[in-house]
Amino acid sequence: MKPRVYSNLKKLWEKHGAHDFGRISQIFFGFCLIERQFQIKIFQLTGRPDIVAVRNNKKFAFEVKTQSGSDVAIKNEDLLGVKGYTEQAIIAVLSYPDLDCMWVLAKANDIRAGKWPIAFLKQHSISSLEDELNESFQKIIEKYFTTAYLGTTSLYDVFEEVCKLEKNK
């Protein structure tokens, strides 16, 4: 990732704290899915799964996580929220505060609850989809950073509008 992406994420973390940073990251992830031609069927900031999306008649369930250190905590509830729900059950983790922050998309059926380093989750990732979404992530942060800086509500309002426009296409 470009240094500017890391810098912008750091600004959002410092301004909003861990809880809202997680929600903002989840909305950014939703924007990435839309840019990659996914149709968002479910998007919720609380509850599980966080996102259900469809592309090419294939359904995906995502639990979106952020981390504040070297490991990410994956709860049993996170896994149960996506497992068995769809064809593709994914734990999506933003690797911030790593300098080369990126999305890691781990197959939920391949892992168990616990604290895991990003390197472990990478071993269970869907790398082709991961590459697609990470390519979009830089653009999404640049496009929506100012709105995200205002807060979760402002960014979510824009996200809802984009979702409505996509449904009407």
What is the predicted function of each stretch?
Residues 7-16, 36, 42, 66-115:
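Catalytic cores of nucleic-acid endonucleases
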Residues 33, 51-68:
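Conserved catalytic cores of phosphodiester-cleaving nucleases, focusing on short active-site segments
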Residues 1, 35, 98, 104-169:
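Non-catalytic C-terminal interaction segments of nucleic acid-processing enzymes
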Residues 48-50, 98:
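Short secondary-structure capping/turn micro-motifs that flank functional sites
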Residues 51, 59, 90, 146, ...:
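N-terminal cationic amphipathic segment used for targeting or macromolecule association
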Residues 1-43, 47:
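Acidic-basic catalytic patches of nuclease active cores, encompassing PD-(D/E)XK
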